[in-house]
């Protein structure tokens, strides 16, 4: 259904209720908007999560977990694909400044060379977790001119223009993944700040990008802006959510998957988090090949402590829990010096 009357009152009953699911044929409902076109992505990007949009003149740049696309939207009723750049990595948020395109990479499988084979090793020189920089002066032939690695990757980022600095642009990075091993990126630490002042927790990264030499982009500051925050009060999960989580955990356990107590409930730990840890255990015993049952048993015993360290301690510790160790998005207002 569609409503475009300009009314400030939401339609009732809610037209979104009961819409059918689908990849390209899902049900739709709009309010005060008109759909001008529906253009599918190229096949390599279909069925893969899309992320952010950025705009440059007549172009829309569409982030996707398999890379990014550039669309000519001069005619919004018939967008034309200009560039499709295959470069898998979550979450591929995009921003553009002049001729530079910035793309976030956070997942464990993203590669520096943009290959689709992923990265299985717990520690690898091929992994990209951080910020990719492309020169899109020739928008049909973008060039990867720089990469900046960070300890927690880049879930999202924000481009910041300092009105007093015309030679550089700055990118604020927020990474929400686990801290990578120091063997992969020296200086990374998942210890609490009181144990290690160089901890990668509770901070963002500020990257300085020289406009004339973007290949020299580098981290220039890591402000610990979340220090001393405490976990906000929570009303807890709804009974149906608790029941669904318990059912999912029981089914996962029956299939041999990993579960652990986290935030007061048994949770399923996703394979993409488990695989690198198993690989590390195999490597620690100088083994090769897939993990054994004994390796899995070692990880199951260690997992509660690993999760407690990564996600803020256990519920038995007295006092308020630590607050978030990262944020999702960063909003800035450079003209008044606020973020």
Functional labels for PLM-detected ranges:
Residues 1-339:
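Feature marking well-ordered beta-strand scaffolds used for ligand recognition
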């Amino acid at each position: 259904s569609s409503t475009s009357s300009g009314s400030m009152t939401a339609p009732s009953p809610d037209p979104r209720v009961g819409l059918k699911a689908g990849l390209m044929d899902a049900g739709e409902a709009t309010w005060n908007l008109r759909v001008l076109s529906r253009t599918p992505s190229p096949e390599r990007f279909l069925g893969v999560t899309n992320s952010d949009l950025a705009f440059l003149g007549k172009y829309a740049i569409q982030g996707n977990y398999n890379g990014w696309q550039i669309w000519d939207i001069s005619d919004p009723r018939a967008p034309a694909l200009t560039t499709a750049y295959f470069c898998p990595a979550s979450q591929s948020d995009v921003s553009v400044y002049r001729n530079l395109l910035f793309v976030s990479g956070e997942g464990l499988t993203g590669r520096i060379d943009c290959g689709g084979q992923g990265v299985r090793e717990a520690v690898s020189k091929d992994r990209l977790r951080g910020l990719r920089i492309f020169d899109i002066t020739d928008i049909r032939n973008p060039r990867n001119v720089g990469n900046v690695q960070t300890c927690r990757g880049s879930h999202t980022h924000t481009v910041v223009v300092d009105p007093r600095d015309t030679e550089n642009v700055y990118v604020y990075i927020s990474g929400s993944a686990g801290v990578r091993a120091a063997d992969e990126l020296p200086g990374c630490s998942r210890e609490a700040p009181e144990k290690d002042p160089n901890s990668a927790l509770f901070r963002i990264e500020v990257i300085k990008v020289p406009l004339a030499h973007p290949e020299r982009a580098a981290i220039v500051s890591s402000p610990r802006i979340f220090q001393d925050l405490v976990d906000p009060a929570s009303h807890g999960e709804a009974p149906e959510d608790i029941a669904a989580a318990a059912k999912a955990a029981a089914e996962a356990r029956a299939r041999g998957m990993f579960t652990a107590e986290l935030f007061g409930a048994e949770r399923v730990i996703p394979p993409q988090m488990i695989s690198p840890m198993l690989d590390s255990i195999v490597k620690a015993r100088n083994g090769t090949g897939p993990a054994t049952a004994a390796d899995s048993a070692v990880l199951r015993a260690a997992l509660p402590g690993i999760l407690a360290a990564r996600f803020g301690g256990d519920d038995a510790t007295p006092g308020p829990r630590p607050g978030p160790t990262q944020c999702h998005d960063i909003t800035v207002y450079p003209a008044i010096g606020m973020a």
